[in-house]
């Protein structure tokens, strides 16, 4: 049975892990849930990796990650290239920074030793190669020294990254923002769903990986707008080609992500329009990055628009969970038995 296509995940990232005991020990992985994955690496929850299982190197910390991957397959492709920059075909031979000087018993090139500088330099390289340069990715740094090392490399290399590539820092130590965990038994690094903030239990940071949205909540208003437009057939005409959109004809249609704008257009029209509006006219490119809506003139990002579109056409269950109205729990009624018990205790 052929698996049904899924919507673009709320979050899927490739992360860099560092031992807090020995900073030279590093690990690269991918996950849709960084807090849970960090708990696994630290042995708090089952499911870590062999290379991070040594207690002498624990605890580990996530010092940086790249988010915005459209699927687990896309993230794994990037992870493999970052782990094996000496053999990855995504890196042109003339641009390669990592080289193997030894071979394994099977004759394959042996992976060169990793260092923070080598990982960051190859990360910078991968973000600029044709395979990944136009993906809707975002780079996050959670440690000042790692971000400083990134800055030093960017300052010395000639190859520049795409100007619209977001690089975000969230060090958090100075903010001191914390939230109460649901219970003391919930392990550090596992963010509970539906925390009510009543207090009690241990505290979990709200910065760094714990501040990343793990669900579609940031898109709730956008998704609701798209559902409303198509449910009540308010598509109107394409914002680009001006052709009337027939609800019966099918096809894929993207919606402007800006609040208050209901601009809808054919997917191919949006793509051509955004590519053409780029500097140089998007010459040779297939995948748009972003631009401005032809109706409201507000900024739009292709990755965000595609996430809403895939939710609308492939993610019925996810949309229902996102838009359902949460009922407030009714106050518990006092029973006669409870009253009698309290009187006996008092």
UniProtKB/Swiss-Prot annotation:
User: EC number(s) on record?
Assistant: 3.1.-.-
Cofactor(s) annotated in UniProt:
a divalent metal cation
Name the domain of life: Eukaryota
Per UniProt, residues of the GIY-YIG domain are 10-92
Region annotated Disordered sits at: 324-346
Similarity remark: Belongs to the SLX1 family.
**What is the protein's given name?**
Structure-specific endonuclease subunit SLX1
Annotated organism of origin: Podospora anserina (strain S / ATCC MYA-4624 / DSM 980 / FGSC 10383)
